[in-house]
Amino acid sequence: MKMGMAKHSPRNKEYLCLTICGYRKEGMSEEAYRNHMVNVSAPMTKDLMVKYGIRRWTQIHNQNATRALMAELFDPQMCRLADFDCFSQVVFDNIEDYKRMKQDPWYKKHLMHDHEMFADTKRSMMTIGWIKEFVVDGKAV
């Protein structure tokens, strides 16, 4: 099997997940950042993702109010707080699907420029890996 291809069978379904650990643009408030991502970028992006076979796309907004909740979860092993403003996760079968989406003329014209409106693209980071589920809808799998 080629690297970047998901492994499929009825009992073993694995997808790739691109995780973008994002920082907001300098000087932008948390609320303005979240608003732009949810109400401007997402509506422009989601149909294009569907067109290219993206299975799932989520945003996790890591604002001061939710970061404060971490004090209730820290323990001696887990005590370092990630300072990213958002985690955006894109799930797909094949890395080629995502690459084709990024080559779409509409993506190049509208979305590449949009990232500069809200994101600190110099500090934000990415990683990719296989998803392996152990609990789904409250049930062990």
Curated annotation (Swiss-Prot):
InterPro entries noted in UniProt: Dimeric_a/b-barrel (IPR011008), EthD_dom (IPR009799)
Highest taxon of source: Eukaryota
GO molecular function: lyase activity; oxidoreductase activity
Enzyme class at the top of the EC tree: lyase
Span of domain EthD: 26-121
Induction (free text): Expression correlates with the formation of the sclerotia and thus the pigment production and is directly regulated by the cluster-specific activator CPUR_05433.
UniProt entry tagged with the keyword Chloroplast: no
Pfam families reported for this sequence: EthD
Record key words, sorted: Lyase
Keyword Ribonucleoprotein part of the UniProt annotation: no
Xref: Gene3D superfamilies: 3.30.70.100
Disulfide bridges in this chain: none
EC number(s) recorded for this UniProt protein: 4.1.1.-
Reactions performed catalytically: atrochrysone carboxylate + H(+) = atrochrysone + CO2
Its biological purpose: Decarboxylase; part of the ergochrome gene cluster responsible for the typical purple-black color of the ergot sclerotia. The ergochrome gene cluster produces several ergot pigments including the yellow ergochrome secalonic acid and its derivatives, as well as the red anthraquinones endocrocin and clavorubin. The pathway begins with the synthesis of atrochrysone thioester by the polyketide synthase (PKS) CPUR_05437. The atrochrysone carboxyl ACP thioesterase CPUR_05436 then breaks the thioester bond and releases the atrochrysone carboxylic acid from CPUR_05437.
Similarity section: Belongs to the tpcK family.
Protein name per the record: Decarboxylase CPUR_05434
